[in-house]
Design a protein with these regions (language model features):
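Glycine-rich phosphate/pyrophosphate-binding loops
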Residues: 93-95, 109-134, 355
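Long, compositionally biased intrinsically disordered regions
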Residues: 37, 210-302, 397-555
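N-terminal leader/transition segments
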Residues: 1-64
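N-terminal catalytic cores of NTP/NDP-binding nucleotidyl/phosphoryl-transfer enzymes
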Residues: 78-113, 332
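A translation/RNA-centric and nucleic-acid-associated enzymatic feature enriched
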Residues: 265-328, 332-345, 367, 555
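A structural-propensity feature for long, helix-poor, extended segments
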Residues: 137-140, 365-397
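A glycine-rich helix N-cap at a beta->alpha junction
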Residues: 140-169
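Short acidic, glycine/serine/threonine-rich loops at helix termini
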Residues: 96-97, 132-139, 234-238
Length: 555
C-alpha cells in the first residue's frame, strides 16, 4: 500500500451526545429533518426568518475571497442558507477534527442544495474571541517513536482573547512541525503556516489567516468571531440576554435539573449568579462574565461608550449565530452535541429560534508505514489504545519457550502446594484459620507477578526496535493517549500526501451528509464502518476504547 486510508469512524462522545445522534430526547433537541422534503421545509423556514441583508452586515468579518467569496455571494443573492461549524484557535490550525468539521459543513451544504434547490454555503466560525490560551497554544505531531506535543508561550498576560493575544516565539514549534512532515509532496501547507505565523501577529490572527488560505479554495468561508462587525450585529441580542439574565438563568437551572434527572451529566456546569455575556474593555484586556445582579444595569446603558465590548459565552454563541446568519444547521462535535441540550433552553428564554445541531463526520487516517507496522507485528489497533498492552504481549511472545514454561510451572506448583498446606491445616487441630494460607498465597502471587513484570521489562529492553515501532504506531493512532483526530495536526498529512487526504476526507464526509439528509439508519456510514470492523474482529474495534482528549470545544 502506497497511499493513506481515510476511514470513517463512529463519533463517540458522552451518553448525552449519543442520545442526540440517535434522535432521542426530543424535548432538548430539535428534530433533525428526516427526508429531502423535511430539509426543504427547514431551509424555507430559515429563509423566511432571516433578513435579506445579513451578508452586508457581517461581510468584513468574513472577508471571503475566491471560491468561498463567490459561493457566499451566490447564496446571499438567492436568499439561501448556510451550514455552519466552528472551533476555537489551535496551534497551526489545531487537530484533524478542525478539518473534519469544515469538510462536514461543506458536504452537508452541497447535499442540502442538491436535495432542496435552496442555495447553501458552508461557514466556519473561528472563535477568536475565546480566551483559552491553554487550548490555543498546542498541537501534536506523529514522529518515529511516538507523538510530540508542540507548544508556544503566551506573548502577554493570560486573560485576553486570542484575537488580542500576541503570538509568542513560534520558531521551535515550527521547526518541529517541519521535521514531522518529513518528505513532502505538497509544500503549500507549510508555506501557509510560514506566512500566517509571522512576527507581530496574534494567536487568533494567525489561526484565521491559515484557515482562510486553506479552506477558501474549497468554497468554505471563515468568519472572524472577534471582528467588530460581529460585535455590532450581536450587540442587540447580547443586551437582550442581559436584560433577561434572570429568565435565562431560571431556564438553564430547570434544564440542568431535567438532564440530571434523566441520568445524564450536563456538558457545561451551571455557574450560579453569572449571566451568559462577557465584557472586556474596548482597548483590550481581560474578559469578565457579567453577574446577573449587574446585567439589567449594563443592558440599560445600551451603547454607552463607557461600557466595554460584549461577547457571548459557549451556550449563548450558537443562539447569536443562528440569529445573525441564515443557519440551517450547525455541524457539531460530540461535546457540542452534549451542550446543545442546554443551548435549546437559552433560545426560547430570549424569544429566539433554537439552532439545529447535527453530528459531524469522524475519521482516522492510516498512513502506509503505520499499516505496515500493524501487519508486521500482528497488532490490533485497540491494543494501542491502552498503555503497555501491545508491548507486554509482544515482549512475552519474545521470551524463550523454556522461560515461559518455567514461569507457568512455578505458578502451578505454588498453587498446588498452597492447596496441600491448606488441606493439611484443615485436617489438623491447630488453632489457625485457613485464611492465613490464602493470604500467604496472595503474597507469593504478588511476588511472582512482580518477577514476571521484571522479566517482561527485560524482554522489552532487548526488543528495542519492536518497542519503537509500537510507539510509532501508537503515536500515529492514539497520540498522547487520545484518538488521532483529537490531537494530531492535519498539516503533516497534507504535506506528505497532497490532495489525496482531503479528497478522501471529502468522500467520507459526503457519504455522511447523504445519511444526514436521508436519515436512513441502513445508510449510516459510521455505523456501517463500526459493524464491519466488529465483524472482522470482535476485540479490535479502534473505537471501542473511548479515549477522549482535553480538547473542550469539540470534545
Amino acid at each position: 500500500m502506497t497511499e493513506p486510508i481515510v476511514r470513517t469512524e463512529p463519533l463517540g462522545g458522552t451518553a448525552l451526545a449519543r442520545a442526540a445522534i440517535d434522535g432521542q430526547r426530543g424535548e432538548w433537541y430539535p428534530e433533525i429533518p428526516g427526508s429531502e422534503q423535511a430539509w426543504k421545509a427547514r431551509a424555507e423556514a430559515v429563509r423566511a426568518s432571516s433578513g435579506r441583508e445579513w451578508l452586508d452586515a457581517i461581510r468584513p468579518a468574513l472577508s471571503a475571497s475566491g471560491a468561498a467569496g463567490a459561493r457566499l455571494a451566490r447564496v446571499a443573492a438567492g436568499r439561501g442558507v448556510v451550514v455552519t461549524t466552528g472551533q476555537q484557535p489551535g496551534l497551526f490550525g489545531g487537530p484533524i477534527y478542525t478539518w473534519s468539521k469544515a469538510l462536514s459543513a461543506l458536504a452537508l451544504a452541497d447535499e442540502i442544495e442538491a436535495a432542496t434547490g435552496v442555495p447553501a454555503a458552508p461557514v466556519f466560525w473561528a472563535a477568536n474571541d475565546d480566551a483559552d490560551f491553554a487550548e490555543a497554544s498546542w498541537t501534536a505531531v506523529a514522529v518515529a517513536g511516538g507523538a510530540e506535543r508542540l507548544t508556544v508561550a503566551a506573548g502577554a498576560p493570560l486573560g485576553r482573547t486570542m484575537a488580542d493575544m500576541p503570538l509568542g516565539d513560534v520558531a521551535p514549534a515550527f521547526a518541529a512541525l517541519l521535521r514531522a512532515c518529513g518528505a513532502t509532496v505538497d509544500a503549500r501547507p507549510i508555506d501557509v503556516v510560514r506566512a500566517a505565523y509571522r512576527a507581530g501577529t496574534t494567536v487568533g490572527g494567525a489561526y484565521l489567516s491559515l484557515l482562510r488560505d486553506l479552506f477558501e479554495p474549497f468554497g468554505i468561508a471563515v468568519l472572524d468571531a472577534a471582528h467588530a462587525s460581529i460585535a455590532e450585529a450581536a450587540r442587540p441580542l447580547l443586551l437582550r440576554a442581559l436584560d433577561r439574565a434572570s429568565v435565562v438563568a431560571d431556564a438553564l437551572r430547570e434544564r440542568d435539573e431535567a438532564i440530571r434527572a434523566a441520568g445524564f451529566t450536563p456538558q457545561v456546569a451551571e455557574v450560579p449568579g453569572l449571566s451568559l455575556v462577557f465584557e472586556r474593555a474596548r482597548d483590550g484586556g481581560d474578559k469578565r462574565r457579567i453577574p446577573v445582579t449587574e446585567a439589567a444595569a449594563v443592558a440599560a446603558q445600551g451603547d454607552s461608550p463607557r461600557r466595554g465590548l460584549l461577547s457571548p459565552n459557549v451556550l449563548l454563541r450558537p443562539v447569536i449565530e443562528r440569529a445573525i446568519l441564515p443557519t440551517v444547521a450547525y455541524v457539531a462535535g460530540p461535546g457540542e452535541l452534549s451542550y446543545f441540550a442546554l443551548v435549546t433552553a437559552v433560545a426560547p428564554a430570549l424569544g429566539l429560534d433554537s439552532p439545529l445541531a447535527v453530528p459531524r463526520w469522524s475519521t482516522t487516517i492510516l498512513e502506509p508505514h503505520v499499516v505496515r507496522i500493524l501487519s508486521s507485528l500482528g497488532l490490533e489497533e485497540a491494543e494501542l489504545a491502552e498503555p503497555h498492552r501491545a508491548e507486554g504481549r509482544l515482549a512475552r511472545k519474545a521470551m524463550s519457550p523454556a522461560l515461559a514454561r518455567a514461569l507457568a510451572d512455578l505458578r502451578q506448583e505454588v498453587g498446588r502446594h498452597s492447596g496441600a498446606v491448606s488441606s493439611a491445616l484443615e485436617a489438623s487441630d491447630l488453632p489457625l484459620p485457613t485464611q492465613v494460607i490464602d493470604g500467604a498465597q496472595r503474597a507469593i502471587d504478588h511476588r511472582l507477578e512482580r518477577l514476571e513484570r521484571r522479566i517482561v521489562a527485560a524482554a522489552k529492553r532487548r526488543e528495542t526496535e519492536t518497542m519503537t515501532q509500537i510507539a510509532t504506531a501508537r503515536g500515529a493512532l492514539f497520540p498522547l493517549g487520545t484518538r488521532q483526530e483529537r490531537a494530531l495536526n492535519m498539516l503533516p498529512f497534507m504535506a506528505r500526501h497532497g490532495n489525496v487526504i482531503t479528497d478522501r476526507m471529502i468522500t467520507g464526509a459526503r457519504a455522511h451528509a447523504r445519511w444526514l439528509v436521508g436519515r436512513n439508519p441502513e445508510t449510516n456510514p459510521s455505523a456501517a464502518a463500526q459493524a464491519a470492523r466488529r465483524a472482522s474482529s470482535s476485540e479490535s474495534d479502534v473505537s471501542a476504547p473511548r479515549v477522549e482528549s482535553a480538547r473542550t470545544a469539540d470534545a
